[in-house]
């Protein structure tokens, strides 16, 4: 019963966060016609590396998509499960930056796992980078992934900065991340890991 109640509570909070963001987006309905609304939605419930805990980030995609359509978004790109490799995510970001114009509204949503990594450039006080986990990223170093498949906060910053420069100060960039980057934000103990989006295991 406790697990069921936790899942219901978690799903409610996720829906509430998304609802609040969409209400925020609806506030831009009265903007000039030249302003274009673009969205990138990434949702993961399955991973190539099966050692990742079970989550349902892919289920967020249709919910968010439906709300964005109601908010009259012009273009919505979705990457779900095996589509959401690091290469495809980065490509989607770059294409979004390429197509974006001054004053556009950009909405980016990521639902999936997160993980800390050892900081490689010394810009983090705690010595750790946070990262999104694409479909092809592994929890532990292996022949298939030595960390290059993770999407670090440094990389995300570069990708977002490109978009921000294109839309300018008159544009709006909204980023929603439903993931646990360090493994400390959990709703329950290890026996209920199916609702934990992340890991407290650092990628070394």
Q: Where are the model-predicted features located?
A:
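N-terminal secretory signal peptides that target proteins for export/translocation
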Residues: 1-14
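Bacterial N-terminal signal peptides
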Residues: 15-27
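Boundary at the C-terminal end of the N-terminal hydrophobic targeting segment
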Residues: 32-34
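Caspase-like (clan CD) cysteine peptidase catalytic core
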Residues: 36, 75, 87-111, 116-188
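Conserved beta-strand elements of the Class I
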Residues: 38-40
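Glycine- and acidic-residue-enriched helix-capping/strand-helix junction motifs
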Residues: 47-62
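A generic structural signal for short, well-ordered alpha-helical segments in conserved domains
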Residues: 61-65, 76
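Short beta-strand elements in bilobed, periplasmic/extracellular small-molecule ligand-binding domains
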Residues: 70-79
